[in-house]
Amino acid sequence: MNLDKVIAGFFIILAMTLNFGFFYGDSQDIIMHSKYELFAAIIVNIIATVLKLGDKTQMGSVLIASSLVADLQLIAAATLWTIYSTNNTISPEIFAITISLSGGALLANITSVILYIGDTLQSKR
């Protein structure tokens, strides 16, 4: 068992599950989506991206690209939420965009997990 792969896999899967936790729920109900969970998803996604930087393979390049997409979309979602929220309220349009951006990041994270599992299954024991 390779400890580096275990740690990287842990953060890749944790990034996806935190992102799903933020994304899931009624897109019109702000109470269903925690800004702290969005912040945690951003931090864990950035950690997962940094852990992927050491992989010099073609698969590593695709994994880094998918992580960068997720990072960019989550940071954009948090930026929108921060800029447009006033007195703990946010317009439904901006909130819908925030949820949509996190959904795009979730797709990038799912892609990353599928590729990571595929790469693990193809590697020699």
List where the protein language model places each region.
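N-terminal signal-anchor transmembrane alpha-helix
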Residues: 1-40
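Individual transmembrane alpha-helices with interfacial aromatic-anchor signatures
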Residues: 92-106
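Membrane-helix interface "capping/anchor" motifs
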Residues: 2-6, 53-62
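Membrane-water interface at the C-terminal end of transmembrane alpha helices
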Residues: 104-125
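Canonical alpha-helical transmembrane segments
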Residues: 42-57
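Cytoplasmic-side transmembrane-helix entry/capping segments in multi-pass membrane proteins
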Residues: 8-9, 36, 60-68
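Hydrophobic alpha-helical membrane segments
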Residues: 48, 64-82
